[in-house]
Every structure is written in structure tokens, then in C-alpha cells.
């Protein structure tokens, strides 16, 4: 590809979007950023990305715009606390280590220096296979922040009926991708 762009990254792309992209262009995203947490492990999408050479970046692992309940459900989880106690680590450190051991890129957000130091202190222990499985078992498919199944027809048009969107998306996944590629080509003259 001639031009200024050497790599693109995408956000909240589902497997169907990535498949549609690969069907209409030779562009392979360098990274797909999407929500991953113990309550929503996204194993199938992670595997698809990693199998196709797309780096996975976790976002919104702890955040929630509307309520603190799901966030607290992670931070107060007894299984995560027990694992943390074993290593003398916080629940946040356990979850960050869980992401790291899956080969997932993470950018934990903080403005508070003690939290930054806490986030960095995850390289002096390794979770066992059993502990990784135990954390995976918390999965409920619960989005803490952004649910791509309910908010992604065309460019950011809200869809009221999730089932309606899923049906549309299964039959027209390339529409979203084509719109995106056109926007990229227009913006960067490629």
C-alpha cells in the first residue's frame, strides 16, 4: 500500500467485522481494542485475533460509565481476593496479570501515582494454570461499558433492538467495514 499509513488499529470489531474486512481488502489490522474483563473474557474473539496475527488490546477492564456495581463485582470478588492474598497482590494486580499472561496488551488508566506503581508491580509473580482457569470461570458475557452488539450499524447509529441488529450484522457485516475503509481512504488520501 502506498501512502502514509503503515498500520491500522480497530476498536470493538467483532469476529464478523474482521472476517468482512479480510474478504474485501488485504488490510489486516495491527490491533483490535475491545472490552475484556473477568466478567467478559471474550475468549473466542481473542483466539480469532491471535490466530490471525492481530494484537489484542484490553480496554474498559474495570470501568463503567453508568454504574459502579459491575466494577465492584470484580474488585470485591472473593475468588480474585483469595488469589491476591496468596501473592500479596490487589485484585487489580491479579486481573492485570491475568491479561498479561494471555498475551493481551493493556493500558490501565490512572492519574494517581500509588495506583500507577501498583499497576506496574505485576511482574514478580505468575498465576498458575488453575488460577487462570478460575478467573476465566467468572465469565458471564457481561459488558461493563460498550456493547458492540447494540451500537454499531453504519457509523455509531444506535440500534434499539439487539436481535434486529445481530440479524442485520450477520447478513451485512461488510457495510460497516466498507464505510470505515472509505472514511480512512478519504481522510488520509490513500
Residue ranges and their predicted role:
Residues 1-190:
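Beta/alpha (TIM)-barrel catalytic core signal, keyed to glycine-rich beta->alpha loops juxtaposed to Asp/Glu
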Amino acid at each position: 500500500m502506498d501512502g502514509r499509513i503503515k498500520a491500522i488499529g480497530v476498536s470493538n470489531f467483532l469476529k464478523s467485522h474482521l472476517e468482512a474486512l479480510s474478504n474485501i481488502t488485504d488490510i489486516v489490522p495491527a490491533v483490535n481494542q475491545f472490552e475484556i474483563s473477568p466478567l467478559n473474557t471474550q475468549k473466542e474473539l481473542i483466539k480469532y485475533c491471535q490466530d490471525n496475527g492481530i494484537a489484542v488490546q484490553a480496554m474498559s477492564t474495570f470501568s463503567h460509565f453508568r454504574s459502579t456495581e459491575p466494577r465492584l463485582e470484580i474488585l470485591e470478588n472473593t475468588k480474585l481476593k483469595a488469589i491476591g492474598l496468596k501473592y500479596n497482590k490487589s485484585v487489580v494486580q491479579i486481573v492485570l496479570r491475568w491479561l498479561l499472561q494471555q498475551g493481551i496488551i493493556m493500558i490501565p488508566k490512572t492519574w494517581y501515582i500509588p495506583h500507577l506503581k501498583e499497576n506496574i508491580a505485576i511482574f514478580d509473580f505468575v498465576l498458575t494454570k488453575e488460577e487462570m482457569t478460575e478467573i476465566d470461570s467468572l465469565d458471564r458475557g457481561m459488558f461493563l461499558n460498550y456493547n458492540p452488539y447494540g451500537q454499531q450499524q453504519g457509523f455509531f447509529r444506535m440500534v434499539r433492538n439487539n436481535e434486529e441488529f445481530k440479524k442485520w450484522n450477520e447478513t451485512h457485516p461488510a457495510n460497516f467495514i466498507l464505510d470505515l475503509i472509505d472514511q480512512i481512504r478519504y481522510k488520509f488520501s490513500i
